[in-house]
Amino acid sequence: QAAASGALQGLRACAARVIPALLPFFVVSRMLTALPLPTPWRRADRLFRALFGVRAACLPALLTGLLGGYPAGAAAVTELYRAGALSKAEAERALCFCNNSGPGFFAGLIGAAVLGDVRRGLILYGLHALSALLTGLLLPGSAPPAALRTVRREKPVLSSLLPEAVQGSCAALLQVSGLIVFFSSMLAVLRAAGLTALLPNRLAEALACGALELSSGILLLSGHGAEAACALLMGWGGLCVHFQAMSLWQTAGLRPHGYFSAKLLHGLLSAVLALACFAPSPAALLSAGALTACALLAPLLRKIRAGNLRHAAV
């Protein structure tokens, strides 16, 4: 009975929040990658390589992830790789910082329902977006400048472009919804078995549940002082989100080995910045300043190291 109740709750969440929020971004992402559009961002390749170690072609995926939410960024990166806009190494690297949450989740669920202040939710979204960029800056190394795959595609027929994009997006959303229902059912069983009651306090329960399924953990938090915990969970994303992203990128043969470490780093960066913003203390401010400085210096250090390697080769 607990499993059925949890599954029903997951289905309601999919119908009310997940599908309406993600479907437009999934469809637009597929349509854009199918069209032979010009790529004006190629001029920014040198800047993007210095900052993030990938081509500037990942910018649409980064924006899609920050606007559409989990796992729209992973879907966009996968489509860019399929279209030949990113190499395999670049796509796997981009997945580590392009799969993020969107402003709707922060404003609606965190701001209005959890913190009771939409403005604080939007501030947390800004910190979440900043932490995603810092994560991309702090990733070690860079994707090798390999030649892009030549993808042979027929000229798209405009009359079939939208139906095909909707069909592919619905198939992807079916996988995403199935995982949400499964994790919701599993959490309901764990609660019914009394396993979550073994945790020492409500914060520990929220973090444990959120590590598995994001919204379940977020809803256990409330009031002032919950900002850092919300930021940590949103940066991490939860195993349910990660399995959703995996179901998308594995269909293209991608294997981003540093993905989980990057999402953990994203969560920690978000939590430190939230502490510095909402509960300022010397330690939190010092940590936030040090992390930001490291992120800003990372491109310079990467460029210096690349130059040293070239000189050594000569």
Language model region names:
Residues 51-115, 208-222, 228-252, 256-265:
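Alpha-helical membrane segments and immediately flanking helix-loop junctions
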Residues 21, 25, 29, 65, ...:
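Alpha-helical transmembrane segments in multi-pass membrane proteins
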Residues 95-99, 103-155, 184, 244, ...:
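Alpha-helical transmembrane segments of multi-pass small-molecule/ion transporters
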Residues 123, 127, 163, 167, ...:
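Alpha-helical transmembrane segments of integral membrane proteins
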Residues 142-167, 303-314:
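Intrinsically disordered, low-complexity non-transmembrane regions of multi-pass membrane transporters
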Residues 1-6, 33-38, 108-109, 115-118, ...:
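Transmembrane helix-loop junctions in multi-pass membrane proteins
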Residues 1, 287-302:
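Hydrophobic core of alpha-helical transmembrane segments in multi-pass integral membrane proteins
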Residues 1-74, 159-221, 310-314:
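Membrane-embedded alpha-helical segments and adjacent helix-loop junctions characteristic
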